[in-house]
Amino acid sequence: MLRKPRRAASSCPKSWNEERGLKTMELYQLTAEKLSDMLANKECSSVEVTQSVLGRIESKEPEIGAYLTVCREEALNRAAEIDEKRAKGESLSRLAGIPVGIKDNICTRGIRTTCASHILENFVPPYDAFVMDKLNDAGAVVLGKLNMDEFAMGSSTENSYFQKTRNPWNPAYVPGGSSGGSAAAVAAGEAVLTLGSDTGGSIRQPSAYCGIVGLKPTYSSVSRYGLVAFASSLDQIGPLGRSVKDVAMLYSAICGRDPHDATSAVREYPDFTAAVKSEVKGLRIGIPKEYFGEGISADVKESVWKVAKTLEGAGATLVDVSLPSTDYALSAYYIIASAEASSNLARFDGVKYGYRAKEYANLTEMYENTRSEGFGAEVKRRIMLGAYVLSSGYYDAYYKKAKFTQLRIQEEFRSAFQSLSLIHI
C-alpha cells in the first residue's frame, strides 16, 4: 500500500527493558545476531523488537531524516505474523523477525520507490526486487524506505529531492552517500539491518562515515533485478549492519542465482557467517602503496595502519603490493558510470510512469520539460557527461579507453590476489 513520506505515527509502549526492570541496552541497540538468539530463545518477541525500533524512528527522525517512507502498521503486522509462526514451532531463519530498512532505489511491491527523485515521487512498483523476495522468504520485517542521493548519484545524501540526511554522531556532518539513509538508520538505531546499493562506494563510504559495517558484494553474487539502474556494469545491492557477523548474515540471505538477471552467477554460496570465525593467523594482507600517497587524510591513514598492525599482531603477514592503474580508477569510473547512466535514465520520459510536465506543445517538448523539471542538477550533469562521452567522435577517446582501464585494474587486482588473502585499503 502507498505510503507518503511521514514520521512514525504513534508512540511505542514501554521498552522491553523497562518492563523487566533492567538497565541494559534497549532492543533497538542490539545486533541482529544477538536479537536472533533472543528471539529463538523467546527472551523477547519480534513485535517488541519492532516496537522498539519504531519508537527510535519516531524520536530520532526529526533530527536524522533517514526515512522517506515508514511502514509502521505493515511492520507490526509482519512481526506479529512471525511471532505466531515461532509460537507454533515452525522452522524459521536467523533473520526472521529482524527489522530491516530498504534503500529507496530497490523496488518494493505496493510501497513507493522514489529513488529520492521528483520524477519518481509517486511511483509504486507492481513487483518486488529479487532481494525483497529473499528477505520476505527469510521472515525479515520491512520497516520502510530510506533516503539517498537522487538515483544514487552523490556521496553525501544531500542530493535527495525530499530532504537531507544527517550523520547520527554529529548532525552538522553528512552521513556519506549515496546510501546515507541506510547507514544513518543503522548508526542511529532506526534499523537493525539495512540494504543499500554501491556503484562507486555508495555503501562503503557512508558506512565508514557512520561507524558501521557495509559490504559491496562481488558483482553477480546478488541479483540486480528490481534495483533501479544507475550504471549496470557497476551497480550492486549490499548489506549494512552494526557488525561483520550481522552483515554476513544479511549477505547470506540475499545472494544467489536469479534467472531474471543475466549477470547473476550460477554457483553455490556458503553461509558467510561461518567465515567470520576464520583465523587471522596465516593471512597474507596486501598493503598497496598507491592508496597511502598524497591526498589521504593523516587521521584516515593512521586509522587504516592501526588496523593493519592489529591484524599483524594477530598473526597475519603484511605484504607490500603495487596497483599502478589505481591512479586512473576515478576518471574511468566517472566516464563509465555517466555513460551507462545516460542510457539507463533515458527511460524516464513521462510516457509510461513517473512525473510528467504540465505544460508542453508537442511530444518532444513533453520529454524535454519532464526531464528538466523531474531530474535534479547532479543527475542532469551526469546524463549530459554520459551523452557527451558516448557521442560520435568521443566514444573511442573516452568510453573505450575507460573500459580498457577498467580491465587493467581488474587484472592487477586478480594478479595480486594470486598470492594474497586480502588487500587492506
Predicted segments, located by residue:
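An N-terminal boundary/leader segment
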Residues: 3, 11-13, 18-77, 300, ...
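Acyltransferase
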Residues: 46-51, 80-83, 296-322, 353-355, ...
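Residue-level signal for inorganic ion chemistry
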Residues: 53, 75, 247, 285, ...
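Acidic/His- and Gly-rich active-site-bordering loop/insert found
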Residues: 75-77, 85-160
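Short helix-loop capping/hinge segments that flank enzyme active sites or metal/cofactor-binding pockets
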Residues: 95-115, 274-286, 339-410
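Short glycine/serine-rich loop segments
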Residues: 127-257
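A short helix-breaking turn/cap at a secondary-structure junction
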Residues: 216-307, 364-369
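Conserved small/polar residues in nucleotide/adenosyl-binding loops
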Residues: 423-425
